[in-house]
Amino acid sequence: MVAVAILAAGKGTRMKSDLPKVLHPLGGRSLVERVIESCALIKPERICTIVGYRAAEVKMALAHLPHLEFVEQTEQLGTGHAVQQLLEPLKDFVGDVVILNGDVPLLRPETIADLVSTHQKNNNDATLLTAQLPNPTGYGRVFCDGDNLVTQIVEHRDCNDAQRKNNRINAGVYCFKWGVLAEALPKLTTNNDQQEYYLTDVILHCDKVMAMDVADFQEISGINDRFQLSAAYEILQDRIKEKWMKAGVMIHQPDTVTIDDTVQLEPDVMIEPQTHLRGNSLIKTGCRLGPGSLIENSVIEANTTILYSVVSDSQVGENAQIGPYTHIRGQAKVGEQCRIGNFVEVKKSTIGNNTNMAHLSYIGDATLGAKVNIGAGTITANYDGVNKHQTVIGDRSKTGANSVLVAPITIGEDVTIAAGSTITKDVDNDCLVVARARQKEIKGWRLQS
C-alpha cells in the first residue's frame, strides 16, 4: 500500500499575502490541488495533508476533494516536525509513504509513479527525487556513490564551499518505508543552523537510500514568491499549449495565448493571438477564437467564430458569428447560425437559431425565437429597481433601431416594431407596432426680434 503526505502548513511570507501560500492559484487550480492531482497514477490508499497556517481556510478550499485527510501542525518547526505529525494518524499503516511539498505544483504523475516503482523494485528504505541544476543555490545538496545510493544530504545553508559545487540537489520529494520512517522520526534533533527538525536527517537512520534524478528539472520548481509563481505559470502554459498543438489545435503566437488545463479543445480549432481560455470550457472543432477573446466556463459549438469578445458561463451554437466587442454572460444560450455583433451584451438569455443582433444592443433575461432580427440600439429594460423581469420575442420578429422593450413583456411571432418605439404592453402575432410621438413640424417657432 502507498500513502501520500503533503506538507501544506507554511504561511509563505515571501508571497506578501494573507492567503496561505498553497492556496495561490496556478492556471485555474491552487498549488496544493495540483500536488494532490499529481498522485493520480500511484492510486494512494490515503492522502494526508498537513496544515498549519490558516488551517480552516485550507481545509475549506480542499473540501470538494474526496478521501482527503487533514493533520494539523500547530507550530511550524521544520519539515521533519511536519512529518512527525503523521505518527498518530498512520500508527496502524503498513506500506510506503510518499512525501510531497504543497508548493511544488509541476510534478508530473509519471515522475511520482517512477519514484515509487524505483523505491519498491530496489527494496529501498528511502528513495528521494533529485535534480541536476545549472544553478543549485538555495537547495540542499545530495551526495551519492556510483550506484546512486545516498551517502549524505546537506542543506544549502549548512554546506561548506566544496559541497556547494555539487549541482545535484534534493527536490524535497521522498518515498519511505513507513516502518523505517516512523522509527526514525522521534530521533530527529534541531542541531543545525535553522534550529529546525530536518526531514533529511532521517536518512542517517536508514540503511538503504537511493536517489533518482528527474528528467526535467523544471518539474521540481518550488513556489516561494510571486516571481516564481509567474515562472511556474509559464512552464505550465508551455506544457498545455504543446499538448493541444500536437492534438491538432492551431495556436498563433502561443506566447500571447493562455489556456487553463481544465479547458477541452477539439482538433482544427484555431486560436488567434491575445486569446484566453479559462475554467471548464469546451471548444469544438472548426472554431476560430480571437484575436483578443476571453472564453470562460463556456461551451462553443463547432465552426463558430468569436472575435475580440468575452463569453462567460454560457453556450454558443454551431456556425455562429460573435463579435467584435460582444459580451455574452450569465448562462446565456445562443443558437446555431446566429450573428451577435459590435457592442452587444447578452445576459441570462436564450437566443433562437438564425437570430441576428448586429450592433449596440442589450438583451437581458430574455427568450428570443428563431430568425429574430434585433435592430441597432434595442434595449430590453429588464430591471424595475427591485426585480428583474422577462422579455419574450417570438420567431421572425424584428425590432427597429433604438427600440426599448419594457419587461415583463411578450412580443408575438412575425411582429415588426418601428424604430424609436418604447413598447410597454404585450404584442400579438403578425403586427406592426409604433409607439413613439408623432413628428411635428412647427414653422416660424422662433420669436421675432
Curated annotation (Swiss-Prot):
InterPro entries to which the protein is assigned, alphabetical: Bifunctional_GlmU (IPR005882), GlmU-like (IPR050065), GlmU_C_LbH (IPR038009), Hexapep (IPR001451), MobA-like_NTP_Trfase (IPR025877), Nucleotide-diphossugar_trans (IPR029044), Trimer_LpxA-like_sf (IPR011004)
GO biological process, one term: UDP-N-acetylglucosamine biosynthetic process
SUPFAM superfamilies from the UniProt entry: Nucleotide-diphospho-sugar transferases, Trimeric LpxA-like enzymes
Residue positions binding acetyl-CoA: 376, 382-383, 419, 436
A GO molecular function held by the record: glucosamine-1-phosphate N-acetyltransferase activity
Domain of life, per lineage: Bacteria
Pathway: Nucleotide-sugar biosynthesis; UDP-N-acetyl-alpha-D-glucosamine biosynthesis; N-acetyl-alpha-D-glucosamine 1-phosphate from alpha-D-glucosamine 6-phosphate (route II): step 2/2; Nucleotide-sugar biosynthesis; UDP-N-acetyl-alpha-D-glucosamine biosynthesis; UDP-N-acetyl-alpha-D-glucosamine from N-acetyl-alpha-D-glucosamine 1-phosphate: step 1/1; Bacterial outer membrane biogenesis; LPS lipid A biosynthesis
Spans annotated as Linker: 227-247
Catalytic center residues: 359 (proton acceptor)
Functional summary from the UniProt entry: Catalyzes the last two sequential reactions in the de novo biosynthetic pathway for UDP-N-acetylglucosamine (UDP-GlcNAc). The C-terminal domain catalyzes the transfer of acetyl group from acetyl coenzyme A to glucosamine-1-phosphate (GlcN-1-P) to produce N-acetylglucosamine-1-phosphate (GlcNAc-1-P), which is converted into UDP-GlcNAc by the transfer of uridine 5-monophosphate (from uridine 5-triphosphate), a reaction catalyzed by the N-terminal domain.
Similarity section: In the N-terminal section; belongs to the N-acetylglucosamine-1-phosphate uridyltransferase family. In the C-terminal section; belongs to the transferase hexapeptide repeat family.
The protein's name: Bifunctional protein GlmU
UniProt source species: Picosynechococcus sp. (strain ATCC 27264 / PCC 7002 / PR-6) (Agmenellum quadruplicatum)
Annotated gene: glmU
